């Protein structure tokens, strides 16, 4: 047993390991930023509301409908070799303790024991639907195995706008997941000797802790810079179709540039980065921002008999968007 994660990592990174097995064998560093800190705060607010009976987001109320016995922040471990699962504890803060090399730990935001359901909260950005989402499938599998369920409801709740997506996993779906997990494990083992030949870029790169050391990202950046430089000053002479193709490439480049920024930030978390000229260095600096808690203010206004919508303001602006032709 070990306190370190095995090559399968944790449940939240399972999609990336399935798509890009080489990334599991590169150096890595966690990415901490304002967005992730806010996401953690949103999760904690809902957790406290569930546990202590406070005001909850509508999507959380929906998830709890019909349930009187539930737990928050439940930690499990699934063994891909044996197919077994165990509950490690609750509210552990990702401190999973001793794990075997073939175990995958994960934390489930909400487990409804009397309705056989698991839920994961997301802040805003959409992810794959529950029955196609490795993290949610693993959560459903773990809870079902530990609690003896033949089927389990798996749900994602988006806290920013109270949208949700729900699916069901049957015992057959669980068998399929276990086969998938074993295939992922085999792929990761095969990538150990030559990680660079088992890399693949895609949406899963966004939060990859190995991005700063990834040769696939370096090669992609070099190719795209040359293509976009050729477009400078020529847009007016191009056909509309060529401009459309340039727009698609630009979007991909912007996504890549954002990932490079994150990689630089990860490196700067570990050491000062000297800038050209020798007079400045790039370094991480702790910052804070104070703002009103809109959620709390809306609750307070409602308590006072005021409609929070009276105090909303709409700002109009133009935005370049893709629409159906």
Stretches found by the model and what they are:
Residues 1-117, 144, 151, 165, ...:
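Metal-dependent nuclease catalytic cores that hydrolyze phosphodiester bonds in DNA/RNA
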Residues 27-29, 199-206, 312-315:
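Short coil/turn segments at secondary-structure boundaries
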Residues 27-28, 120-125, 237, 241-245:
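Glycine- and acidic
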Residues 29-35, 125-128, 193-198:
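Short, polar/flexible loop-turn hinges at active-site or ligand-entry regions and domain interfaces
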Residues 69-73, 163, 211-213, 217:
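Charged, terminal alpha-helix-loop-beta segments
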Residues 72-192, 313-314:
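Mg2+/Mn2+-dependent nuclease catalytic core
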Residues 84, 248-251, 255-325:
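Extended, charge-rich alpha-helical segments
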Residues 179-251:
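Short, charged, low-complexity amphipathic alpha-helix
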């Amino acid at each position: 047993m070990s306190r370190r994660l095995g090559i399968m990592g944790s449940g939240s990174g399972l999609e990336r390991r399935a798509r890009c097995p080489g990334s599991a064998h590169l150096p890595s560093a966690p990415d901490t930023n304002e967005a992730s800190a806010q996401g953690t705060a949103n999760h904690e607010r809902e957790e406290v509301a569930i546990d202590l009976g406070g005001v909850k987001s509508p999507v959380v109320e929906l998830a709890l409908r019909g349930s009187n016995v539930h737990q928050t922040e439940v930690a499990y471990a699934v063994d891909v070799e044996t197919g077994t699962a165990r509950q490690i504890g609750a509210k552990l803060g990702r401190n999973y303790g001793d794990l075997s090399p073939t175990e995958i730990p994960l934390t489930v935001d909400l487990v409804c024991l009397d309705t056989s359901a698991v839920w994961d909260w997301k802040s805003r950005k959409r992810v794959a639907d529950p029955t196609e989402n490795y993290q949610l499938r693993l959560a459903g599998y773990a809870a079902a195995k530990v609690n003896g369920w033949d089927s389990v409801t798996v749900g994602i709740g988006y806290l920013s706008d109270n949208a949700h997506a729900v699916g069901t996993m049957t015992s057959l779906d669980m068998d399929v997941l276990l086969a998938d997990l074993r295939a992922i494990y085999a792929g990761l083992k095969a990538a150990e000797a030559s990680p660079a030949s088992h890399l693949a870029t895609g949406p899963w790169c966004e939060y990859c802790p190995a991005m700063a050391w990834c040769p696939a990202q370096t090669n992609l950046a070099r190719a795209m810079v040359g293509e976009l430089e050729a477009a400078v000053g020529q847009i007016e002479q191009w056909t509309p179709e060529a401009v459309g193709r340039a727009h698609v490439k630009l979007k991909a480049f912007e996504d890549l540039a954002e990932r490079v920024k994150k990689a630089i930030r990860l490196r700067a978390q570990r050491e000062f980065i000297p800038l050209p000229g020798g007079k400045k260095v790039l370094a991480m600096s702790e910052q804070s921002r104070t703002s009103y808690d809109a959620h709390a203010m809306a609750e307070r206004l409602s308590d006072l008999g005021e409609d929070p919508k009276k105090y909303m303001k709409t700002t109009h602006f133009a935005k370049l968007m893709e629409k159906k032709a």
